[in-house]
């Protein structure tokens, strides 16, 4: 067997879990939770009292961090574990916008990241396109969770006038 037959494609997460368990009773407003297999930010938590047949239960209302859709998880026993997504936010300098809607971003180590599309949020999309057209130095914040990535914010770091 030659070496070519044993080439493995390296993945950035190296098999790391996309979520971690957290007891439902400890998840608070503005924390994160997985509801219906989607990473969400918790906007409301209510807890019912312990009944004669069991546990206190938690009710979560949360917003999907990528689609902004409202999701609810109804009455999870507070002692049970819920999945919580690993959420990361990374800043990249915007280098280019392609005609097919992909952005070219400069990473910290000097490489380019070219696999991300422009955001679907209209106001953010307009700010990015207008700022880029004006030749401003723009830095975009990319939120990543559960294998998805999306541009979520924009900063002008002092432009070429």
Swiss-Prot record:
Q: Where is this region: Disordered?
A: 1-21
Free-text description of this protein's post-translational modifications in UniProt: Lys-52 undergoes hypusination, a unique post-translational modification that consists in the addition of a butylamino group from spermidine to lysine side chain, leading to the formation of the unusual amino acid hypusine. eIF-5As are the only known proteins to undergo this modification, which is essential for their function.
- Residue ranges under compositional bias (Basic and acidic residues)? 1-12
Modified positions (Hypusine) in chain numbering: 52
The record's annotation in InterPro entries points to: IF5A-like, IF5A-like_N, NA-bd_OB-fold, Rib_uL2_dom2, Trans_elong_IF5A_hypusine_site, Transl_elong_IF5A_C, Translation_prot_SH3-like_sf
Query: Which NCBIfam families does the protein's record reference?
Result: eIF_5A
Question: What is the stated purpose of this protein?
Answer: Translation factor that promotes translation elongation and termination, particularly upon ribosome stalling at specific amino acid sequence contexts. Binds between the exit (E) and peptidyl (P) site of the ribosome and promotes rescue of stalled ribosome: specifically required for efficient translation of polyproline-containing peptides as well as other motifs that stall the ribosome. Acts as a ribosome quality control (RQC) cofactor by joining the RQC complex to facilitate peptidyl transfer during CAT tailing step.
Could you identify this protein by its name? Eukaryotic translation initiation factor 5A-1
Which organism was this protein described from?
Medicago sativa
